[in-house]
Amino acid sequence: MRKCPYCDFNSHQADRFESNGKLPEDAYLAQLLADLDADLPYVAGRKIQTAFIGGGTPSLMSEDFYYRLMDALREKLSWADNAEITMEANPGTFEQEKFRHFRQAGINRLSIGIQSFQPNLLKTLGRIHNREEAIHAVDKSRAAGFDNINLDLMHGLPDQSLDMALEDLSLAIELNPEHLSWYQLTIEPNTEFYRRPPTLPEDNTLWGIQDAGQALLTQHGYAQYEVSANSKDNRRAAHNLNYWRFGDYIGIGAGAHGKITLVNGEIFRTRKTRHPNHYLNNLPEVLVIKEAIEQEDLPLEFMMNRLRLFETFDLKDYERFTYQSVPFSLIKACETALKQGLLDHDEWTQQRVKTTEKGKLFLNELLELFLP
């Protein structure tokens, strides 16, 4: 397996870390649990609502690894009833029996990275699966016992037409997942696409894809609740909702990120060393980096997350999640957004915030108003 040319996430080729043809599962599990022990004070007295197992293709680890990991997590953490526990999966490495064990271990939601069903686009994206494997991955997930599945699908791909984008989306809808993450390709720094930019669709085509695609999703019962997220029967991604509502989370593992709010109002982010070898070797100077969120940056940090969600929220949520009074700068920015038609006037009169349809379309311009 190799890294995809558009991916800026913390993924590394597995063959670089294999010993005698095997991943260093025992060593990695031991380091994960030591990492968790160090972060336990941050979650003391809290119920864990969700977990997300991501980073490349975590399903490459064995069934035994996940039985041991989940047993340890249940022992060390206090879990809410019906907690959502998601694993990312790659259609090109899908084994039904293995995923049946993952389900028995306690993982109850899958996020399958399909991205496209079309051979030419899959090749451009560096994906190792094909159309049939993508379809079979969903079928095998159901057979393994998963009743909560997300499909990741991309649009705005190199040389992609409106018809091609809708063909991909239509097939994804036919597979009837509970959740569809349908997001536009963005060229990120430190990726192959950034170094050698492909030819992307023109803006008019991108707008057409977005409009027609969202209409198709709505027609088939998928409600858009976030910029790129759509769910059926309110099966929204609880883990991501916590991110976007500015909730707290800990991150364990190589490259994992966390956000913690202390009772004194201090808010900081953590990130663990990205490279698995450094992580396994427990190098103290790179294992954990803590970065405080400065008070003047809080309005942007908060709104940058909350405004991704297409839901109304109370202005007092700012105080509840930041332990700070609503600053005048935030009020002023909201008033400017109201004048520009980016926020809803009726909700604002009730001290609530909601983006208008124009605000959804021009989200970047809306967020710029909250820059310090």
Give each language-model segment a name.
Residues 339-348:
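A short, conserved structural fragment
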